[in-house]
Structure formats: C-alpha cells, structure tokens
Design a protein with these regions (language model features):
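Transmembrane-helix bundle segments that line or gate the permeation/cavity pathway
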Residues: 27, 231-241, 245, 275, ...
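Hydrophobic alpha-helical membrane-insertion segments
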Residues: 182-193, 267-295, 430-431
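Alpha-helical transmembrane segments and their helix-start/interface "positive-inside/aromatic belt" motifs
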Residues: 174-182, 258-273, 419-424
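Hydrophobic core segments of alpha-helical transmembrane domains in multi-pass membrane transport
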Residues: 18-24, 92-96, 185-189, 227-231, ...
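Aromatic-capped, Gly/Pro-kinked transmembrane alpha-helices
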Residues: 284-439
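Hydrophobic transmembrane alpha-helices and their helix-loop junctions in integral membrane proteins
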Residues: 2-253, 260
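Transmembrane helix-loop junctions and nearby membrane-interface residues
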Residues: 99-100, 127, 242-245, 276-283, ...
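Soluble mature domains adjacent to a membrane tether on cell-surface and organelle-surface proteins
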Residues: 251-259, 266, 278
Length: 439
C-alpha cells in the first residue's frame, strides 16, 4: 500500500484546504450536511433522485479525491486521512440509524445513500491503493443499486400515490416485477453475495483491516467493526421496508393497483442486471476500472500525462516532479463469488425449511389497537397466539433499547434551517482548527 507523502503547509494553504473540503462535503451530503439529502430526495421525482444519488453526491467525493490526491498530494496530507476516515465512519453509522427510524420510503433511501457514501469516503481516506480501489468500486456499485432502489420507490409512488410505509403493504401481489427487482437492489446495498455490494464492501473491510495491521492503529479495526455493523443495520432496514411495502396485508384501497409500464420495468432490469454482473465478475471491474484509476491517483505524473499527453509532466516540471511510493494491488480483485452464492443458497434453504416447519395458525381475535397499526402495536395490550408481521414494527425492540440515542438524534434533526446552518458553521470551524493544528 501507499500513503500520501508529507511536507509543510502554510496557514493560507491550510485555510484554503479546509474551505474546499467543506464545500465538497456539502455537495456529497456527508455528516453534518446529511439532512439536506433527505429533504432533496423527498421532494424530487424518482428519476431526479437517481441523478442526485448517482451523480451529484459522487461529484462531491470526486472533489475530495482531487483535493486530496492531486491538488495537495505533495504538500503533506498524511494526517488528513484520519479526518476523512472519521467523518466517513460517522456518516456510515449515523445515517443508517436515521434510516431505521424513517416512515417515508424515499427519505429512508436518502439516508441510506449517505450511509453508503460514508463507505466510499472511509475507503478513499485510508490513502492506500486497496482502499482507494475499493472506494471507487463501491461508488460505482452505489450508483447502480441506489438507482434501482429509487426507481422501485418511484414505481410504488406512481401506482399508489404514496411513499408512507405505514400506509403500504402487500404490493408483491400486485407488482411482482417491481418487488423482485427491489429485492435485488436491497440485497446489493446490504452486501449479500453474489451481488455487487458484497464485493466492494469486502474490499473495504480488507482495506481497513490491513491498514490497522500496517500502522498498528487499533482505531482502524474499530472502523472495520463499524462498517460491518452498518451492513447488518442496512439489511435490517430493508427487511423493514420489504415487509412494510411489498409483503404482509394488502390495504383495501390498493386492491386495484397494477404493475408499472414495461418501460419502467426495463429501466429497473438494466440496473438489476448490472448489480449482479459487477458482483459476479469483480476482478474484471478492479482490473479495468478501479485499479487504473487508483494508480493514476497515486501518481500525479501519470495523471497529468493522461490528461495532457505522454511526457508533458516531465517537460513542464522537469526536476520538480513529485515522487510517491508505488502501489501494491496483489490482493485486489480476487474472490470466489460462486462459492459464496452456494453458501447463501444453502443458508436460505435452511432458514426457509425452519420457517415453514415452525409456522403458526392465524387467529383473528385481538384487543387494543387495530391490527393494521404498524407502530407500537404491543403497547395496545394485544393478546393472541399469532399476530401479522405487517401489524407491528419488527425493530421496535432495537429502537426501544436505543431510545435515548434516537431521542437525541430526533432533537438534533429539528427541521429548522437555522439549526442546519449552525451545523455547517461548526463543521467549518472544526475543519479549520483540525487542519491548522494537525497538518
């Protein structure tokens, strides 16, 4: 692996770096600018949400990459990686927990989008060849599976007129194509093999672990744990969405809902096929896409020559050519996706057998709140041998145990623009102080 080299920066350069970093962070919607993403996606049409998630947020990450690896690479940013990794890890965890608490389909996807951007920022911030390659791979994968998920949410909104998770349910009976394609996106973002999210997340886990082994810094092991926990919570969140939107009881008002037009299905199919293909053939992606980009990122000379022509950097810079360490990619692009697919199929088969053999008979008698209520049902005093999955919040126990954390997050996310402007000012101040002191 390779670390960015170090030298001295003057105060003006540090201030410029801090201002540029905050600007690109705002464009990427990373913490503490994440509430902007939820509002933007909530108001935008599904097709625009695909562009916001797939292009706009990536432009912020691209700016940070250019800032870190090209503009300031030879000016001493070795310590800056800790800020990027910290902010990326916080974005991962905070936004996935915010997603768990959402009751709107598109706002939930918006918070997941920023959580996945946290993965990308963390990987890029490691300043290693493997980490950079993993970050680019996950950025590409995020564009694919999040585009698919937003199109699925748009299909649901188009046919039902709502994205309220508490009003939806049972749509798999009416929209089987949308349901199946949504599940492909859900499995991909959750990091399940053989979909693309597993491949890129596995690279990120490996990159953070190797960084910890190389530096002896136990903090990078904590980052690995945070990334793994975030994946588990992501899967939990999409289990919630699946049972709230596509499974369970179909409300009477949606009895006449039909599948979306073929053109909308084809668009989702394209994303779904790419999610599977980039997961089954990760070595192709790393060899021809991410590895060349990573090599260019760690060599300013190579990047300049790629943009301006071979030999241009040597002609213009002469003896001032920057020297960076070589990058090792010995373990990039090696997986056995077929083996992991076999393990997944066996596990799913075992779970299905257990679930079918342990099913219960349904009883209709219930006291307290209506069975249709999807939140805090069991406070209503319901007494029955069996209750519908769609009738309760699957993760109420988790949220109850974390109630103080969620109450704190609820108070922070007040919805008042002035509060969010204060967050931006505080973030800018902290970035300036960190860069002035540490770099």
């Amino acid at each position: 692996s390779s670390d960015v080299c170090s030298s001295d920066l003057n105060n003006s350069t540090k201030l410029a770096f801090a201002l540029l970093y905050i600007g690109f962070s705002t464009k990427a919607f990373i913490v503490p600018f994440h509430p902007l993403a939820a509002d933007a996606h909530g108001a935008a049409p599904a097709s625009i949400s695909v562009l916001i998630s797939g292009v706009l947020t990536k432009s912020g990450i691209y700016g940070i990459i250019r800032l870190t690896y090209f503009l300031f690479q030879t000016m001493g940013l070795g310590s800056f990686q800790f800020l990027l990794v910290f902010v990326g890890s916080v974005s991962m965890f905070v936004c996935v927990t915010m997603a768990l608490a959402q009751h709107d389909f598109k706002r939930l996807l918006a918070y997941h989008s920023i959580s996945q951007i946290g993965y990308v920022l963390t990987a890029v911030g490691l300043c290693t060849g493997l980490g950079f390659s993993a970050g680019l791979y996950h950025a590409m994968n995020h564009t694919l599976f999040k585009g698919l998920l937003f199109l699925a949410a748009g299909a649901v909104l188009y046919q039902t007129g709502t994205t309220d998770l508490d009003e939806l349910g049972g749509l798999s009976k009416k929209m089987p194509w949308t349901t199946g394609l949504f599940l492909v996106g859900a499995f991909s973002i959750s990091g399940l093999p053989p979909f693309n999210g597993f491949a890129s997340k596995w690279m990120i886990y490996q990159a953070t672990y190797e960084k910890a082994a190389e530096t002896g810094n136990i903090g990078f092991l904590l980052v690995t744990v945070i990334a793994l926990v975030t994946s588990v919570l992501t899967l939990a969140s999409f289990v919630k969405v699946s049972q709230s939107v596509f499974f369970g009881r179909l409300p009477a008002k949606f009895e006449n809902v039909t599948e979306v037009r073929p053109g909308m299905i084809i668009a989702m199919c394209i994303f779904a096929v790419l999610c599977v293909a980039t997961g089954l053939f990760p070595s192709f992606v790393t060899r021809f896409v991410t590895e060349p980009a990573a090599r260019a990122a760690f060599s300013v000379v190579q990047y300049i020559d790629a943009m301006m022509g071979t030999g241009y950097a040597a002609t213009v810079m002469g003896e001032d050519l920057p020297i960076v360490a070589t990058v090792s990619f010995t373990q990039v692009g090696y997986w056995s996706p077929v083996s992991w697919l076999l393990v997944l199929c066996i596990t799913l088969l075992a779970v299905t057998i257990v679930a079918v053999s342990a099913r219960y008979d349904c009883v209709s008698q219930s006291r307290g709140e209506a069975v249709e209520a999807k939140y805090d049902l069991f406070f209503g005093g319901e007494e029955s041998v069996y209750s519908q999955v769609g009738g309760g919040d699957l993760f109420w126990g988790f949220k109850h145990n974390w109630r103080h954390y969620f109450d704190f997050m609820h108070r922070l996310h007040s919805g008042v623009v002035n509060d969010y402007a204060l967050w931006a000012a505080v973030a800018l101040s902290l970035a300036i102080v960190f860069i002035q002191i540490v770099l």
